[in-house]
Regions:
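Short, charge-rich amphipathic alpha-helical segments embedded
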Residues: 69-81
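Positively charged n-region of N-terminal signal peptides that target proteins for export
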Residues: 1-4
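Short, well-ordered alpha-helical segments enriched in acidic and aromatic residues
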Residues: 50-65
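Acidic/histidine-enriched, beta-strand-rich ligand/metal-binding domains
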Residues: 39, 50-51, 95-98, 140
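Low-complexity, intrinsically disordered terminal/linker segments enriched in charged
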Residues: 23-26, 133-146
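Surface-exposed, charged secondary-structure patches
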Residues: 78-125, 134-136
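Short, low-complexity N-terminal intrinsically disordered segments enriched in polar/charged residues
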Residues: 18-52
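C-terminal motif of bacterial Sec signal peptides marking the signal peptidase cleavage site
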Residues: 13-16
């Protein structure tokens, strides 16, 4: 019985060691479900922090490159003046997640003041750490009538 328990513990330990980190390889194409889940969790944490005026937390979720170029005061100013929908959001929904050239793009639909804003987030990975590089409001596709 002791051998069986020891064998089970060893198998569990070995199997947990063999798993690759989610962002070890950033292959072009759609994000894996694990990658998308981690990206969504990261962006959710940043949006929720902004909505709670926890600017230090929101800023800490930006990428190291972003933080080295933009100070926290400038970050707060830009978000407050141009991304009020994130602060006053009534919810958000994650759409497509893709990877191209080692960059992750996550589309997010944010509801605020009876409107839906489509944002495109760009994230990078430094080691195994995700960081938001930028977000931009995307315009809906317009259909041309002929």
């Amino acid at each position: 019985m002791k051998r069986l328990i020891a064998l089970c513990v060893m198998v569990l330990l070995l199997s947990s060691c063999s798993q690759k980190p989610a962002f070890e390889e950033l292959a072009d194409g759609a994000c894996s479900s694990e990658q998308a889940q981690l990206v969504n969790k990261h962006i959710s944490a940043q949006i929720d922090a902004m909505a709670k005026d926890d600017w230090e937390l929101a800023y800490s979720l930006a990428s190291p490159t972003f933080r080295s170029n933009v100070g926290i005061d400038q970050f707060i100013f830009v978000v407050s003046t141009q991304y009020g929908m994130l602060i006053d959001n009534q919810g958000y929904e994650f759409n497509s997640c893709t990877i191209a050239n080692k960059k992750i793009t996550q589309e997010v639909a944010v509801s605020s003041n009876s409107e839906v804003f489509n944002l495109s987030y760009s994230l990078s990975v430094d080691g195994e750490v995700l960081g938001v590089d930028s977000s931009s409001v995307t315009l809906p596709d317009s259909k041309l009538e002929t």
